[in-house]
Amino acid sequence: AYVQAKQSWWEDKATVYAQDEDGAYFLYDMACSAEDYEKLTVGTKIKVTGFKGEWAGEVEIMDATFEIMEGNFVAEALDVTAMLGTDELIKHQNEKVAFKGMTVEAANDAGDAFLYKWDGSGQDGDDLYFNVSYNGATYTFTVESYLCDNTTDVYAAVKALNVGDVIDMEGFLYWYEGVNPHITAVTAGEVASTKSEGVMTYAEYIAAPMDSEVVIEAYVQAKQSWWENQATVYAQDEDGAYFLYDMACSA
């Protein structure tokens, strides 16, 4: 397979994410000198011999040795957003993946957007844990500090997150008691439109001339009055607000 990222090296043991055209591998504590570790650049082809194991759902190759081969391959991140919550997702375990348009959720009852360590007991430089949601389900993602330490762009990006942000991400599809991706990049994502076909955006509504017909979708915030099958209502969406005066409405 081909090296996609190096997580760590310590006492002649390396932990590496590797992938080929068919799938991916997590190489845990593979025998590796410091000199050889420097040779394991992204795309390097290696032949690995070790033992297949599993820990908390993560399938890995342990107690391995390797040799460098001829060849180079860098995987493109596969968008697996739509696979979240399905049996299809685990088939891509350890691959380089992407998630698009996910919403940052509170990481704890205090409303923080991320935690140092899984329980919030850590400090700057430790792993970052944060929650993101898609289609009503919430997932915990991680910035693994051995892979991306506190000097990296992704570490800073996660520390700058706010609850409610919509983000795109890339990383490796790690598993720990369920999906727990190791994230390597975070960027601002696009908010998916929730408006029906033919409905104006707030910007289009503002630009519309007076006395022209408009079609909007919004959420009722308060009812001012009702009289003779006419209602006056305050409505709002994520982009702006509307005053609906004497709108036709039965009791």
Protein language model annotation of sequence segments:
Residues Y2-A251:
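OB-fold single-stranded nucleic acid-binding module
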